[in-house]
Amino acid sequence: MGQQVLKSSNEKMEKAVAAYSRELATVRAGRANASVLDKVQVDYYGAPTPVVQLANITVPEARLLVIQPYDKTSIGDIEKAILKADLGLNPSNDGTVIRIAFPALTEERRRDLVKVVKKYAEEAKVAVRNVRRDGNDDLKKLEKAGEITEDDLRGYTEDIQKETDKYIAKVDEIAKNKEKEIMEV
């Protein structure tokens, strides 16, 4: 029973770190990256639709993103949605494609992005710690029910703590790499 709690906690911590990595992909670091548009929803025939479902997105150059809509009539809606998403991007529409040039980041903007990265990192650490707390609670319930001994409880609790430390270190490492990428000029 205790092993199942450990395995479950480990999987949940892994998912929390993976979610954090996906979240960081949306933080732009001066280079064009299609994932910055992942959360942009276009009002397409009355239904909110992700840009990635409406257009082909390519990165022909390091600082340029090209969006080629499958339906040319939706180009204006896509452009409006990008502006409305407030990503700090200025799309230019030539009638067939939308081009987004990524300007070089200012020092101030870089610092703001580092703060965002740190905020996301803290949220990821809290998620990992919540998994640890839930796992420890489950283990205590098992011990109360007599399914594991007090010694087992202590051992499993230490194992969960080791996993927690490992995943928090992973979050710190990912954050450090992203900060380095952002501060690169």
From Swiss-Prot:
Q: Which SUPFAM superfamilies match?
A: Ribosome recycling factor, RRF
Coiled coil feature spans: none
Q: Where is the protein localized?
A: Cytoplasm
Keywords, comma-separated and alphabetical = Cytoplasm, Protein biosynthesis
GO cellular component terms, A-Z: cytoplasm
- Keyword field contains Cytoplasm: yes
UniProt GO molecular function: ribosomal large subunit binding
| Main location class | cytoplasm
Source superkingdom: Bacteria
Q: Tell me, which GO biological process terms does this entry list?
A: translation; translational termination
One short Pfam name that applies is RRF
* Similarity-based family: Belongs to the RRF family.
Known function: Responsible for the release of ribosomes from messenger RNA at the termination of protein biosynthesis. May increase the efficiency of translation by recycling ribosomes from one round of translation to another.
Can you say what this protein is called?
Ribosome-recycling factor
What is the species of this protein? Bacillus cereus (strain ATCC 14579 / DSM 31 / CCUG 7414 / JCM 2152 / NBRC 15305 / NCIMB 9373 / NCTC 2599 / NRRL B-3711)
